UniProtKB/Swiss-Prot annotation:
Coiled coil stretches, renumbered: none
Family: Belongs to the universal ribosomal protein uS15 family.
Protein name: Small ribosomal subunit protein uS15
CDD domains, per the entry: Ribosomal_S15p_S13e
Subunit structure: Part of the 30S ribosomal subunit. Forms a bridge to the 50S subunit in the 70S ribosome, contacting the 23S rRNA.
One GO process term, biological-process aspect: translation
Transmembrane segments: none
Entry GO terms, CC: cytosolic small ribosomal subunit
Record lineage: Bacteria, Pseudomonadati, Pseudomonadota, Gammaproteobacteria, Enterobacterales
An MF annotation (GO) of this entry: structural constituent of ribosome
PANTHER family hit by this protein: RIBOSOMAL PROTEIN S15, BACTERIAL AND ORGANELLAR (PTHR23321), SMALL RIBOSOMAL SUBUNIT PROTEIN US15M (PTHR23321:SF26)
Keyword terms, alphabetized: Ribonucleoprotein, Ribosomal protein, RNA-binding, rRNA-binding
Pfam families given in the database record: Ribosomal_S15
Length: 89
């Protein structure tokens, strides 16, 4: 259910400020978004998997908190990230 090492490395290099920047808010949000999108396909097939659905809701909540933090700290980076990820906000 998790992302492959290659997929994570690609996201880190795309959204990170440096090559090994895996801790910035943008990278964390991008990784959570990729995992959320991956799980949405899982739930199309496994509708009664409530255990994984709880994990999905936790990821969505964590992403929401990180986006709120980024919006408070730097609105320009927040808007750019929302645009790059294609999130609704």
């Amino acid at each position: 259910m998790s992302l492959s090492v290659e997929a994570k490395a690609k996201i880190v290099s795309e959204f990170g400020r440096g090559e090994n920047d895996s801790g910035s808010t943008e990278v964390q949000v991008a990784l959570l978004t990729a995992q959320i999108n991956h799980l949405q396909g899982h739930f199309a097939e496994h509708k009664k998997d409530h255990h994984s659905r709880r994990g999905l809701l936790r990821m969505v909540s964590q992403r929401r908190k990180l986006l709120d933090y980024l919006k408070r700290k730097d609105v320009a980076r927040y808007a750019a990230l929302i645009e790059r990820l294609g999130l609704r906000r």
